[in-house]
Amino acid sequence: MTTLPNRWRIALAGVVMQVALGAIYAWSVFRIPLTQAYGWSIAEVTLAVTIAIFVVGVAAFGGGLWMQRAGPRRVALAAGALYGLGVFLASFAGGRLWLLYCSYGLIGGVGLGLGYIVPVTTLVKWFPDRRGMITGIAVTGFGCGALITAPIATRLIAQVGALNTFAILGVVYLIAVMGAACFMQNPPDGYHPPGWTPSAAQQQQRSAKTYTLKEATATWQWYGLWALLFLNTTAGIAVISQAGPMAQKSRGSRLLPRPAWSE
């Protein structure tokens, strides 16, 4: 009899992965240092994270198809390598804005898109009895990425500069995501947690029709969900690009201390 891994260990690894990936929400703390150091406009700097988020949608789509064939671990390992590498290569941007776009925006965005879908998709399979709870935990981990990263990045920028901070964080992200990826695996077919018996409604949900891509895109619901996600993401990016400077300029802010370069 095959011994199954502890599902809570997989959940912890998933949260670690999401926290590292969610660090993209801390982008705004780089905005002022980059504009001051290289004379770039706010719009030019913000475009880097805009590219990353745009690429996320495409990469997540491809990653979902790949994960169906190869499993979550390979996808997560690739995500960690690309995400960490993209952020690390941003440290070589200097005055070359195009390199920032290609590294942080394109390469990092692909890694982020591949990685984001892995924990949520994997954990709901291990926690059919607590689908809502485990999804909330995973998504919360992503949201906490900025809460954890922003003050750390702010202090690093003040001490070693924005580019060196990219290098440090890139290595940390690579180790965190690829390390967590080693724990990602699907449960066996028909898996039920010990002592759990699905209700009639849950059994009906688990046996619901699975749509192919062609079938899904033939429904209005698919386009409605896409539009909803697009609007949600657009609003989020608008806030992300301004959150750090707003917090740094607000009196009494405790989340983001006022760094030396803002004085």
What are these regions (language model features)?
Residues 59-72:
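Helix-to-loop junctions at the C-terminal end of transmembrane segments
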Residues 142-189:
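Helix-loop-helix hairpin linking two adjacent transmembrane segments in secondary transporters
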Residues 25, 53-61, 146-147:
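Residue-level signature of mid-helix packing/kink "hotspots" within the transmembrane helices
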Residues 81-95:
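C-terminal ends and interior cores of transmembrane alpha-helices
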Residues 27-32, 214-263:
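Extracytoplasmic gate region of multi-pass secondary transporters
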Residues 2-13, 96, 210-228:
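Juxtamembrane cytosolic amphipathic helices that cap and anchor the N-termini
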Residues 34, 113-127, 134-135, 243:
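Intracellular juxtamembrane helix-capping segments at the cytosolic ends
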Residues 18-19, 86, 97-113, 230:
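Hydrophobic core of transmembrane alpha-helices in multi-pass small-molecule transporters
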